[in-house]
Amino acid sequence: MIFDFDKFAQITASVYPVSPYTLEESLSVFRYYFEKYKEYTGRPHPPIRASQIVRVCQDMPFISREYSGGLYADIEPEAYPALIDRYFATKYRNCDRNINHFFSGRIREMKFYEELY
């Protein structure tokens, strides 16, 4: 299976929601995550649905869902590589490392506090 980031970027652009991040900033986070996923697993990230792309884009600027949807980001896109690196360095049982896992629950919040505080 080959992951086509250009096609992913086109789909993302077509469904991109209002966000404190630009499309390019969000795509840079996705690209970094997908590169680390391939490095970690040895295979490309599986495709994700447009609805999942929208949810991730909506959540990305905010550490906690409680405060999501505002005009100002809680976390800058430039902070994501450190969080993603820490995520892949953490051992999880029965985890496929899909980006949906990274953006679920409080995982990013915990990595944020571990890495940046």
Segments the model singles out, each with a brief description of its role:
Residues 2-117:
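Append "and, occasionally, other polyanion-binding protein interfaces
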